Amino acid sequence: MAKERWGVAHIYSSENNTIIHITDITGAETIAVGSGGMVVNADRLEGSPTAAILAAKRAAALAKERGITGLHIKVRAPGGHNGPWIPGPGASAAIKTLAREGLKIGIIEDVTPTPHDGCRRKGGKRGRRV
C-alpha cells in the first residue's frame, strides 16, 4: 500500500467569496488553489455553496493529481475587530465536497482571527443608531 501524503486545506469563507488553498503539511508550498470567482461568471454568485462545491472539486482534483491522500482543514471567516466571526455559506459545502472527492479528512480547525480588545469598533460612543 502506498504511503499516505497529507496536506492542509485553508478554507477562507466570507459572504462574498470562498477560497480553498491546499498546501503541504508545513504550509510553505502551494499544491492547489480554487475560489468561487474562478468557477462562476457573476460576482453575486461567488459566495454561494454551489461555487464553493465547484472550487473544492477543482482544488481536490489538482491535489490528488499531485499525490495528496488526506487533508487537515483550517476554516477561516473574515474576523478581526470589524468582520463577522462566522464563516460564509460556502465553508461547509467545501468541506463536504473535499470528503466526497475521496480525500481523507483529519483535523477540522477554526482559525478565524479574534480581537483581544485591540482596536475600537467604529460607531462612536453610543453605537450605530439604525
Swiss-Prot record:
<comment type="subunit">
    <text>Part of the 30S ribosomal subunit.</text>
</comment>
<comment type="function">
    <text>Located on the platform of the 30S subunit.</text>
</comment>
<dbReference type="GO" id="GO:1990904">
    <property type="term" value="C:ribonucleoprotein complex"/>
</dbReference>
<dbReference type="GO" id="GO:0005840">
    <property type="term" value="C:ribosome"/>
</dbReference>
<dbReference type="GO" id="GO:0003735">
    <property type="term" value="F:structural constituent of ribosome"/>
</dbReference>
<keyword id="KW-0687">Ribonucleoprotein</keyword>
<dbReference type="InterPro" id="IPR019961">
    <property type="entry name" value="Ribosomal_uS11_archaeal"/>
</dbReference>
<protein>
    <recommendedName>
        <fullName>Small ribosomal subunit protein uS11</fullName>
    </recommendedName>
</protein>
<dbReference type="Pfam" id="PF00411">
    <property type="entry name" value="Ribosomal_S11"/>
</dbReference>
<keyword id="KW-0689">Ribosomal protein</keyword>
<dbReference type="GO" id="GO:0019843">
    <property type="term" value="F:rRNA binding"/>
</dbReference>
<keyword id="KW-0694">RNA-binding</keyword>
<keyword id="KW-0699">rRNA-binding</keyword>
<dbReference type="InterPro" id="IPR001971">
    <property type="entry name" value="Ribosomal_uS11"/>
</dbReference>
<dbReference type="InterPro" id="IPR036967">
    <property type="entry name" value="Ribosomal_uS11_sf"/>
</dbReference>
<dbReference type="GO" id="GO:0006412">
    <property type="term" value="P:translation"/>
</dbReference>
<comment type="similarity">
    <text>Belongs to the universal ribosomal protein uS11 family.</text>
</comment>
